[in-house]
Amino acid sequence: MKLKKFYYKKIKSTNDIALKYLKKGIEEGVILADFQTKGKGQRGKKWISFKGNLFMSVFFEVKNRISLEKITQLNCYIVRDCLQKFTSLKIVIKKPNDIYINKQKICGILQETLFQNKKKFIVVGIGLNLVKSPKIKKYPTNYLNKYTSKKIS
């Protein structure tokens, strides 16, 4: 599947833009942004965005009967395996949708669905702390570039 890319310097939320494209009839694509002003996390939480980190959403139609929970698991495995190529430290999944390194959160995945015209679509938002991480009281955070000598941008 070749996805069309949509790039923005600054937007509210990559997931919100992906949902807007779906509602306009664009059924697949990738949204990339340099900065989000209202990034979203699970259960209405805010994703704190810093310039230089990765903010993206992939959206597409789900054509088989796979459960949304399985899709969430698969997305976590894909992101974990991709990030593992950049460091020798073990990267782990903290269910349901967070990626940790050295017991610190570096990535969150937010999945949203849209049912439209008898079709099921999914939006997979990925927020990856590359160069800076927020200070959060409930859990420790960090950023990937701290743990790799490879250039990631």
Range-by-range predicted roles:
Residues 82-117, 127:
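Acidic (Asp/Glu) carboxylate-rich active-site/surface patches
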Residues 1-85, 89, 107:
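N-terminal lobe of the biotin/lipoate ligase/transferase fold
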Residues 28, 119-121:
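Conserved catalytic motifs of the protein kinase core domain
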Residues 146-153:
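Conserved, helical-rich catalytic subdomain that frames metal- and/or nucleotide-binding sites
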